[in-house]
């Protein structure tokens, strides 16, 4: 049995910690799930935990400190408690609308919001480090506040820190001003002062090694996005697709996925010689999806389910769709990303269809390990052909399913990766 005394006391700093429903949040949960509850504390945002997540997703065992609502720290665990403390959604929506519509208000509001977050995290962090006898910190990437605050807490308290990048930082796309400016200023400082830098794939490692040289490369450790195989293994059944066929996408939908997902919808709408549909399970509001051009139709269904249901849903699909888009706001983020849901897909015992540019690490990783059909051209006819190959070429499909499971156990098994993560703090 793992004992808290075996570990340095850790302060987890994240804007979007579990139980928030996101790939990054789920990966944090997977890495920390088996750590003794007294070995770490979590400094995070109360207001980034939505009501659905609070009710249906899973909280970590460690102590929560909410930097934006200290009075709620380590007390709230139910939907009713979260809702009771929640500000008016109508007021928040009106403020967000004004900020988006008026650039000056957006710049002013964004500066105030980011500045306030950083100050709150630092203030709460100083108190927590002293009270909880923290020995080391780890900042998880967001749009800036968590990792910038980690850097400043190191300067103030002299406690060492690691940085965990789910995506590249400086060259990402941030809609909130002044996130991009701050990223350009602080990324070199954050990397220089970090004891270790954790990334989720070789593409990101190579990107930072090229950008900053050998000294930074030596600090970098790869811990792939992961999930627990036991959630899936008991759900397996033979892959034998029958009409009506179902393509499945699970996860949030933002600018990195939108164009590629629309290509799939177009391909499905044009397939008239068989009964096929797309099911999208995502937490995004339907009004947001409508605004970006993704709506329900006879062949497209938009649904929502808690993370605990995803293994059952994914293992019943005929094809699992994994998109990254062309002509986006940040090609560098597209080229270095590995979506968190990849780990789920690999162990699902179902074929994966990747629709992403050939320049992406995701496409190259899949081809190298032959675990998916990679449609790396933005061509609707070839995408339709890929769908039919996965449904009807059973020899090919069986091979990529087996290769996917092999890749999972090599790189994406949360039981293994959690141990790699734990070793960093002994």
Which ranges hold each PLM region?
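A charged, aromatic-enriched C-terminal amphipathic alpha-helix characteristic of glycosyltransferases
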Residues: 378, 382, 392-425
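A short, active-site helix/loop in glycosyltransferases that binds the activated sugar's phosphate group
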Residues: 52, 192-219, 421
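Nucleotide-sugar donor phosphate/pyrophosphate-binding loop at the beta->alpha transition
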Residues: 157-162, 170-189, 229
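Conserved donor-binding/catalytic core segment of Leloir-type glycosyltransferases
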Residues: 11, 239-258, 265
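Nucleotide-activated donor-binding/catalytic signature segment of Leloir-type glycosyltransferases, i.e.
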Residues: 282, 287-319
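N-terminal subdomain of nucleotide-sugar transferases
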Residues: 1-75, 196, 268-275
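Acidic anion/phosphate-binding donor-loop and adjacent secondary structure
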Residues: 54, 73-78, 175, 221, ...
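Membrane-proximal helix-turn-helix segments that form the acceptor-binding/catalytic region
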Residues: 30, 112, 119-126, 145-148, ...
């Amino acid at each position: 049995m793992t004992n808290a005394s075996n570990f340095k006391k850790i302060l987890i700093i994240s804007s979007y910690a579990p139980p928030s429903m996101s790939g990054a949040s789920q990966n944090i949960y997977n890495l920390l799930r088996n750590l003794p509850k007294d070995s770490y504390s979590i400094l995070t945002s109360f207001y980034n935990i939505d009501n659905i997540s609070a009710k249906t997703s899973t909280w970590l065992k460690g102590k929560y400190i909410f930097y934006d609502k200290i009075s709620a720290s380590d007390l709230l665990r139910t939907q009713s408690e979260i809702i009771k403390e929640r500000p008016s959604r109508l007021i928040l929506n009106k403020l967000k609308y004004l900020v988006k519509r008026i650039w000056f208000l957006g710049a002013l509001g964004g500066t105030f919001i980011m500045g306030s977050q950083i100050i709150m995290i630092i203030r709460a962090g100083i108190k927590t480090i002293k009270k909880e006898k923290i020995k080391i910190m780890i900042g998880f990437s967001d749009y800036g506040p968590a990792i910038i605050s980690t850097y400043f807490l190191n300067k103030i308290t002299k406690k060492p820190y690691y940085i965990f990048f789910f995506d590249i930082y400086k060259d990402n796309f941030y809609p909130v001003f002044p996130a991009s400016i701050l990223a350009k200023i602080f990324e070199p400082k954050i990397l220089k002062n970090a004891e270790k830098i954790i990334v989720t794939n070789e593409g990101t490692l190579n990107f930072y090694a090229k950008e900053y040289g050998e000294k930074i490369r030596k600090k970098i450790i790869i811990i792939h996005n992961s999930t627990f195989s036991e959630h899936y293994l008991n759900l397996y059944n033979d892959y034998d697709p029958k009409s009506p066929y179902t393509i499945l996408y699970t996860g949030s939908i933002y600018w990195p996925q939108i164009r590629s997902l629309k290509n799939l919808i177009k391909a499905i709408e044009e397939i008239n010689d068989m009964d096929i549909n797309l099911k999208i399970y995502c937490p995004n509001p339907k009004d947001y999806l409508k605004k970006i051009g993704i709506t329900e139709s006879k062949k497209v269904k938009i649904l929502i389910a808690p993370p605990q249901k995803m293994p059952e849903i994914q293992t019943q699909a005929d094809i699992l769709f994994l998109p990254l888009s062309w002509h986006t706001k940040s090609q560098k983020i597209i080229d270095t990303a590995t979506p968190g849901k990849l780990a789920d897909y690999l162990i699902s015992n179902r074929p994966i269809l990747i629709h992403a540019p050939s320049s992406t690490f995701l496409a190259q990783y899949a081809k190298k390990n032959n675990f998916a059909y990679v449609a790396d051209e933005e061509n609707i006819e070839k995408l339709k052909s890929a769908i039919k190959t996965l449904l009807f070429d059973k020899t090919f499909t069986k091979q990529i399913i087996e290769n996917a499971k092999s890749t999972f156990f090599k790189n994406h098994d949360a039981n293994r990766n959690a141990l790699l993560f734990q070793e960093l703090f002994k």
